[in-house]
Swiss-Prot record:
The gene is dapA. Signal peptide: none annotated. PROSITE patterns: DHDPS_1, DHDPS_2. This is 4-hydroxy-tetrahydrodipicolinate synthase. GO terms for cellular component: cytosol. Pyruvate binds at residues 46, 204. Keywords: Amino-acid biosynthesis, Cytoplasm, Diaminopimelate biosynthesis, Lyase, Lysine biosynthesis, Schiff base. Homotetramer; dimer of dimers. Pathway: Amino-acid biosynthesis; L-lysine biosynthesis via DAP pathway; (S)-tetrahydrodipicolinate from L-aspartate: step 3/4. It is found in: Cytoplasm. The lineage of its organism: Bacteria, Bacillati, Cyanobacteriota, Cyanophyceae, Synechococcales. GO terms for biological process: diaminopimelate biosynthetic process; lysine biosynthetic process via diaminopimelate. It catalyses: L-aspartate 4-semialdehyde + pyruvate = (2S,4S)-4-hydroxy-2,3,4,5-tetrahydrodipicolinate + H2O + H(+). Belongs to the DapA family. The record marks 45, 108 as: Part of a proton relay during catalysis.
Length: 306
């Protein structure tokens, strides 16, 4: 299974009342697949999965699937710290005809490496849906070790990993221990180029909401052997990469999309909207990069109001 190069970790739009805005989700999904995204990851960290109900997630999977209409991969965030829940959600995503599932390392209960292996193996054996593992120890409290990844990669449906530990030695070891067809995706926009240099496949991106085509150019330049050009793209985009993590993701990206006119709404509690100095820094970076001149979101807002 080839998920592509640029996979957007899609935000979940909410109404002013805090309910899911499925109409805006469909619009955003359509926009993303025509602006550089090979795939969409729905209901991941950026999609605020911890504060969504399963029923909200299932409906969002369906809405995004229909909006994409086969033009890009749709990967469902069906991970959980309950193995049983993760299996049930993954089966549902398969029934909905999605292209893959993102399985986060179980959080809070801190299983051992043996427990992690059994967790992911059980999910893999319960469904034919291709699985992308998701290692993000800064949020989960436990890290999936390269040796465990290599063992899991022997299972037919476990085809890739989103690596968000920020540890390049771990990425190197995963690449060394896994077959070449096993996909390694950067979980941080700013580490896309370094991970490409270690045999990575692409990125699960937040910034691609705003600069999808540029990220495609970065990765394609590297793939063509034009490493200097890839570095130029990386350095040009680097201030945006950092600004989008000035506070907890997805708070900054939702603020940026609202500035562009998208009706994505605020984050759900316990997250709070971007304010004060952070908001000013983000706005300045967007202005300097010409991203507030984008008319797509504002045009939709005007059309909706009329």
């Amino acid at each position: 299974m080839n998920f592509g190069r640029v996979l957007t970790a899609m935000v979940t739009p909410f109404t002013p009342e805090g309910e899911l805005n499925y109409e805006e989700a469909a619009r955003l999904a359509d926009y993303l697949v025509t602006h550089g995204s090979d795939g969409l990851v729905v209901c991941g960290t950026t999609g605020e999965s911890p504060t969504l109900t399963w029923q909200e997630e299932y409906e969002l999977f369906r809405v995004v699937r229909d909006a994409v209409a086969g033009r890009a991969k749709v990967i469902a965030g069906t991970g959980s710290n309950s193995t049983r829940e993760a299996i049930e959600a993954t089966k549902k995503a398969a029934q909905l005809g999605l292209d893959g599932s993102l399985q986060v390392v179980p959080y809070y209960n801190k299983p051992t490496q043996a427990g992690l292996y059994q967790h992911f193996k059980a999910i893999a054996q319960a469904s034919d849906l291709p699985i992308m593992l998701y290692n993000i120890p800064g949020r989960t409290g436990v890290s999936l070790q390269p040796e465990t990844v290599a063992k899991l990669a022997e299972l037919e449906t476990i085809v890739a990993i989103k690596e968000a530990s920020g540890i390049m030695d771990a990425v190197s070891e995963i690449r060394r221990l896994t077959p070449s067809h096993f996909g390694i995706y950067s979980g941080d926009d700013s580490l896309t180029l370094p991970i490409l240099s270690l045999g990575g496949s692409g990125v699960v991106s937040v910034a691609s909401h705003l600069v999808g085509p540029q990220l495609q150019e970065l990765i394609q330049s590297y793939s063509r052997g034009q490493h200097d050009q890839a570095l130029t793209y990386h350095l040009r985009l680097f201030p945006l990469f950092k600004a989008l993590f000035i506070e907890t993701n997805p708070v900054p990206i939702k603020a940026a999309l609202e500035m562009q006119g998208w009706l994505v709404g605020q984050v759900r509690p316990p997250l709070v909207p971007l304010q004060g100095g952070s908001l000013q820094v983000l706005r300045q970076v967007l202005q300097e990069m010409g991203l507030l001149a984008e008319a797509q979101g504002s045009e939709r807002r005007t059309a909706k109001a009329s």
